[in-house]
Amino acid sequence: MTLLGRLHLLRVLGTPPVFLLGLLLALPLGAQGLSGVRFSAARTAHPLPQKHLTHGILKPAAHLVGYPSKQNSLLWRASTDRAFLRHGFSLSNNSLLIPTSGLYFVYSQVVFSGESCSPRAIPTPIYLAHEVQLFSSQYPFHVPLLSAQKSVYPGLQGPWVRSMYQGAVFLLSKGDQLSTHTDGISHLHFSPSSVFFGAFAL
């Protein structure tokens, strides 16, 4: 006799409905004819997408620290303090070489400082400037990407300090070169947290 026939017989014989409900709950899902429910539940339990289980690809990044040279020029170093070159970036002839084409955030900071003017001296303005330049096969010359200028008039009130920070996003090509040009190098305040230059892929 089928399951439905047995239940009908029990009901005819006066079996309480509560007992029948308990009997149904006690039966396995397959015996209740509800196997489809079990399979539906299994289908909804999807695993997490693969992209959430794996780490992203590490992108190119570089951070350089400035230091003075005997030629009164600003040189960049990648092997000291908190400086680094990662995932394809390289430093050649004081220029950063772009490893792959794409969008990059390029940034640089310089800090200038100086003493106050002597009471007998005639104050003269000091011109300060810092520029990040691009040299590419598409252009026969250095193209300014970031540029900042300031003029300082030393007074009698004491030492002075001026800082310049610049940063923006650029579309660069593999093999492009990033370099800097600075006016007022003799007034640069060299420290890892004051004079730096870098870029990272987005």
From Swiss-Prot:
It comes from Mus musculus (Mouse). Residues 1-33 form the signal peptide. Cytokine that in its homotrimeric form binds to TNFRSF1A/TNFR1, TNFRSF1B/TNFBR and TNFRSF14/HVEM. In its heterotrimeric form with LTB binds to TNFRSF3/LTBR. Lymphotoxin is produced by lymphocytes and is cytotoxic for a wide range of tumor cells in vitro and in vivo. The gene is Lta. SUPFAM superfamilies: TNF-like. Residues 60-202 form the THD domain. The lineage of its organism: Eukaryota, Metazoa, Chordata, Craniata, Vertebrata. Belongs to the tumor necrosis factor family. Its main location: secreted. One of its GO terms (biological process) is humoral immune response. One of its GO terms (molecular function) is tumor necrosis factor receptor binding. PANTHER family: LYMPHOTOXIN-ALPHA, TUMOR NECROSIS FACTOR FAMILY MEMBER. Glycans are attached at N93. This is Lymphotoxin-alpha. The keyword Membrane applies. Keywords: Cytokine, Glycoprotein, Membrane, Secreted, Signal. It holds the Pfam family TNF. It is found in: Secreted; Membrane. PROSITE patterns: THD_1 (PS00251), THD_2 (PS50049). The keyword Signal applies.
